[in-house]
Amino acid sequence: FLSKNTLPNFPSFIEATHHGPTALKSPVLFAEIGSTDTEYANQDAGELMARCLLEVCKEWKYKRKAVDADRVAIGFGGTHYCQKFTKLMLDSNFEFPYIFSKYGLPEANSLTIRQAIEKSLEPVEIALIEKKSMNAQTRDQLIASLKEVGLNYEMV
């Protein structure tokens, strides 16, 4: 949806997960428009966000799919605003139900990774690791956790 519906001078990014996995039993989607009063007051951005959220809800209601993506992945690494994962989502048709940013990697153990997989609406196929955003020790610990839960991975 976002690849075909943009606003001039108003970039769209996906954000790293910072609210879960949660204990909620229903699907959860967090969305926000910017981080200042200027963005919050942008009516065009609000309308685009509303259309985007309605599209996601329609996909789920009628197709029982969260999105129409080719591949579903959990992302690991990067910053709060996930530019690399946003590009993969838009250019390669990936879906990211969870992204553990660089600052969230200490919580990315086998338990939380398993929860992220189980609580995703679509079956998670692979983990994508932003290699340059973490040191070798962190990457090795992450890979060990991914192997423990049986999730294949690729470096991006």
Language-model-detected regions and their locations in the chain:
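A short, contiguous, amphipathic alpha-helix enriched in charged residues
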Residues: F1-L7
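Short acidic/glycine-rich loop or secondary-structure boundary segments that cap or lie
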Residues: P21-T22, E39-Y40, C82-F85, Q137
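Short, surface-exposed recognition loops or helix-turn segments adjacent to catalytic cores
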Residues: L7-P21, K61-G75
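C-terminal functional modules of predominantly eukaryotic multidomain proteins
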Residues: E130-V156
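Acidic, Ser/Thr-rich low-complexity intrinsically disordered segments
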Residues: K65-A136
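Active-site-adjacent mobile loop/cap segments within catalytic or ligand-binding domains
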Residues: F13-W60
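Short, solvent-exposed amphipathic alpha-helical segments in soluble enzyme
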Residues: E47-L48, L90-S92, L142-E148
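Well-ordered, non-membrane alpha-helical segments in soluble/globular domains
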Residues: G46-A50, S110-R114, R139-Q141
